[in-house]
């Protein structure tokens, strides 16, 4: 089994833009490169660049091999048309690879279940090597996710506004269905050419900001309200034409047509502290942070690419925890986000 994303023509490939990580079954590796490989009808073929491999060996044992990330390096597999496989490691930018770097995690077991658990337990057990990785059983969901919720995306996609949401809250409450949280999922962001311009929502769609919607929270009805955002601003980063205060603008730098948090860890932390604190002050209880694996192509080609992209994830986790905000991580299925 080869683990990679589904491939779409003209789209970014691994290690970027990984919305989901899928198991692609093969008898021979070149099967994955064939045009008649039975993929997913909606998105066609597997990406030939990916995260991990699982082999059933001739002696009945299983071998699991997984690409891993370092402080400023990233590895990944590529399946070639001749049935060979290449393991790459790169900084994805101007920096050279230096010193001793993590490259690959390998485990073997007679059980297909144990080979996975042994591999990940070895990572979580090494706090010095991977201090931020924890087992799912050691994590707690935000309280709201123990209840039934409603997400605007499934009904409206981008076509939302204050009136629609308020009307739907009325409908939910009158229905008697025990919905206890709602998620406002995209369609609200102030942007210019898909770059973030403000943390104030689109004024045409939400003329009163979030106040009227937040006033609808009740302990025995809709108790929590969450909001969608993208990790790096909006889909294509942060616009130079923004309304952020001067001290926040100083945490951003211009690169490849957009502004990005960085370059130092402190500046990245300051940007996410401002971002999360603003959402908390608006009254939101949790955030869905999307587009996480697309952070890499925004930084790619520069310096300290992996480190900065990883710092964005770490700062997001740190600030949501510190400010007691719930968090959904979305489009985060690549080596950097998972490890």
What do these predicted ranges mean?
Residues 43-62, 169, 173-201:
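N-terminal start-of-domain structural block
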Residues 101-117, 121, 152, 160-166, ...:
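Glycan-recognition patch characteristic of GH18 chitinases/ENGases
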Residues 125-138, 210, 271-275:
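Alpha-helical scaffolding within the catalytic cores
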């Amino acid at each position: 089994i080869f683990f990679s994303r589904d491939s779409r023509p003209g789209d970014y490939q691994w290690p970027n833009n990984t919305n989901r990580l899928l198991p692609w079954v093969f008898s021979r590796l070149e099967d994955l490169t064939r045009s008649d490989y039975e993929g997913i009808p909606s998105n066609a073929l597997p990406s030939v660049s990916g995260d991990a491999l699982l082999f059933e060996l001739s002696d009945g044992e299983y071998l699991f091999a997984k690409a891993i990330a370092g402080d400023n390096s990233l590895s990944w597999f590529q399946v070639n048309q001749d049935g060979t496989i290449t393991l790459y490691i790169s900084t994805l930018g101007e920096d050279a690879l230096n010193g001793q770097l993590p490259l690959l995690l390998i485990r073997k077991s007679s059980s297909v279940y144990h080979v996975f658990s042994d591999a990940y337990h070895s990572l979580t057990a090494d706090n010095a090597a991977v201090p931020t990785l924890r087992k799912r059983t050691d994590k707690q969901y935000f309280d709201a996710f123990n209840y039934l919720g409603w997400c605007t995306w499934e009904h409206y996609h981008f076509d939302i506004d204050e009136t629609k949401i308020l009307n739907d809250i009325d409908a939910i409450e009158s229905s008697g269905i025990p919905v206890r949280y709602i998620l406002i999922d995209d369609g609200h962001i102030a942007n210019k050419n898909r770059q973030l311009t403000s943390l104030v929502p689109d004024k045409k769609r939400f003329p009163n900001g979030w106040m009227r919607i937040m006033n609808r929270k009740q302990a025995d009805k809709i108790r929590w309200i969450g909001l969608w955002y993208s990790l790096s601003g909006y889909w294509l980063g942060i616009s130079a034409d923004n309304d952020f205060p001067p001290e926040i603008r100083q945490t951003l730098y211009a690169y490849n047509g957009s502004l990005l948090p960085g370059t130092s860890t402190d500046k990245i932390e300051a940007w996410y502290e401002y971002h999360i604190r603003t959402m908390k002050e608006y009254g939101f209880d949790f955030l869905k942070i999307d587009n996480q694996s697309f952070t890499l192509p925004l930084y790619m080609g520069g310096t300290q690419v992996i480190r900065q992209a990883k710092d964005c994830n770490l700062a997001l986790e740190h600030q949501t925890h510190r400010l007691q905000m719930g968090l959904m991580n979305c489009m985060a299925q690549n080596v950097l986000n998972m490890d």
